[in-house]
């Protein structure tokens, strides 16, 4: 049995090649990979425009434009020479069965983490982060969350599968510690009593990158960190292809600098979510997501090279 069931089951939304043209490996548990990329083509929990199930394919497709650069600016080294990264394709589940997706994703993540691998996941809508957090918390214990988004996703509407409730549920399950967690780029209403430090888009756009990063490091401390990036954190001028766009967001330049600034954190898991290519223009949203994902891998490679 392969990693994800049958690698052809999701062929309507899957790719023939891996992210950045990295090797495809449908048996990553026994591989010597440091990081494993998993696509999660799921959008049943969205409250806005659907289409996030096509996000992983769009990110991989456009990533070929990034594969040529070896001594990537401004890092001046090739991530692939420091990290062993493989792409295991997309999670296979019965489309239409949100619970099965959640259970299979958590089981897949638990097996990878138990084998000593780290995960970079592509959504899919943001709900996919919750089963990933459950798996990571089993392995690493309670974590800090560094969360880029236009929305806090801390809404308590009682729905089991909703991409706006994960970070209300996760603290209650003991997966993350809100007092050591930061939400960056927020520009919609939220409950100020949830314990998270919220750095709204207005202040993040006005403050220096170094100042924001210093505050993030102070809040997170030395806890294990899960990094999640909802692409709607970016302004729709830079990322129109998403389900719930909100104007007044971060530029792609500011976002990439902030991600680079997280290099010294103890990041144990990462994801990029909410790319919906049906609403994209010239693949700029997918390109932003692919570039941010690549930068996430570079901050890991930079630490390994020290």
Curated annotation (Swiss-Prot):
Protein residues bound to Mn(2+): 126, 149, 151, 153, 230, 232
Single GO MF annotation: agmatinase activity
Domain of life according to the entry: Bacteria
Keywords for this protein: Hydrolase, Manganese, Metal-binding, Polyamine biosynthesis, Putrescine biosynthesis, Spermidine biosynthesis
HAMAP family in alphabetical order: SpeB
SUPFAM superfamilies for the chain: Arginase/deacetylase
Name of this chain's protein: Agmatinase
GO biological process annotation, one example: spermidine biosynthetic process
Biological function: Catalyzes the formation of putrescine from agmatine.
Database matches in Pfam families: Arginase
Pathway(s): Amine and polyamine biosynthesis; putrescine biosynthesis via agmatine pathway; putrescine from agmatine: step 1/1
Cofactor(s) required for function per UniProt: Mn(2+)
Catalytic activity as recorded in UniProt: agmatine + H2O = urea + putrescine
EC number: 3.5.3.11
Family, per entry: Belongs to the arginase family. Agmatinase subfamily.
InterPro entries the record matches: Agmatinase, Agmatinase-rel, Ureohydrolase, Ureohydrolase_dom_sf, Ureohydrolase_Mn_BS
Lineage per the UniProt record: Bacteria, Pseudomonadati, Pseudomonadota, Gammaproteobacteria, Enterobacterales
